[in-house]
């Protein structure tokens, strides 16, 4: 994947390269661009999580799959800043991988992880996870996660009030009690469903009783 270095999200000007001819064509069309990036084209799932660290301790974390994005067709990558459809996942390997990444960064930087750390990940064709972004804040779906049992918002307030995380329940690999999904669009409240099986029921589409 070639992408112009324009300091914007969404892969503006990006092109998937399948052969050397595509590469040469991109360079010809964008001859006035002094810098560009080359990255692997990842075909797997978009994964994400939210994790809480306190003075180097990994306190709790939970994961999800960002299956579709709001206004995806406006970006060449089909990835925008907000999730439209997501699945909540009970896959421990996601949080384990992210915690390993944080431990690596702690060692390299010589500082302990502290606060909310939110990962964006993408799987390659073999299902191996690659880090695409790490945010040092709550994500937009933090409130939705709270509704389905993973409430970092309440935990954050408790830490601010207590001055420590002694009263925060340790839960490094949170498991949701149901296969929840959520749907969200611009300027509307998110819709939370207990599973996506409803989409497989033809009676729902045709309002058959």
PLM features: residue spans?
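ATP-grasp fold ATP-binding core
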Residues: 1-10, 33-44
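ATP-dependent carboxylate/phosphate-activation module, predominantly the ATP-grasp catalytic core
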Residues: 12-21, 40-46, 50-106, 135-160
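Short, solvent-exposed polar/charged micro-motifs at secondary-structure junctions
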Residues: 5-8, 46-51, 123, 127-128
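Short beta-strand or tight-loop elements
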Residues: 34, 45-47, 114-117
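ATP-dependent carboxylate activation and anion-phosphoryl transfer catalytic cores
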Residues: 90-209
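A short acidic, often aromatic-flanked loop/helix-cap motif at beta-alpha or helix-coil junctions
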Residues: 2, 22-23
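Structured catalytic cores of enzymes that bind and process phosphorylated ligands/cofactors
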Residues: 29-31
């Amino acid at each position: 994947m070639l992408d112009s270095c324009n300091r914007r999200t969404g892969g503006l000007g990006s092109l998937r390269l399948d052969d050397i001819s595509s590469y040469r064509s991109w360079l010809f069309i964008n001859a006035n661009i002094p810098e560009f990036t080359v990255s692997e084209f990842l075909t797997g799932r978009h994964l994400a999580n939210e994790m809480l660290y306190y003075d180097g301790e990994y306190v709790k974390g939970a994961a999800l799959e960002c299956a579709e994005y709001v206004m995806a067709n406006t970006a060449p990558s089909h990835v925008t800043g907000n999730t439209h459809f997501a699945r909540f996942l009970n896959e421990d390997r996601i949080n384990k991988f992210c915690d390993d990444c944080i431990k690596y960064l702690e060692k390299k930087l010589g500082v302990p992880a502290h606060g909310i750390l939110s990962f964006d990940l993408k799987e390659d064709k073999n299902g191996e996870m690659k880090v695409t972004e790490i945010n040092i804040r709550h994500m937009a779906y933090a409130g939705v996660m709270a509704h389905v049992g993973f409430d970092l918002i309440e935990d954050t307030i408790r830490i601010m009030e207590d001055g420590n995380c002694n009263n925060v329940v340790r839960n490094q690999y949170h498991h949701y009690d149901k296969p929840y999904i959520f749907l969200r669009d611009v300027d509307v409240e998110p819709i939370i469903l207990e599973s996506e099986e409803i989409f497989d029921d033809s009676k729902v589409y045709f309002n058959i009783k």
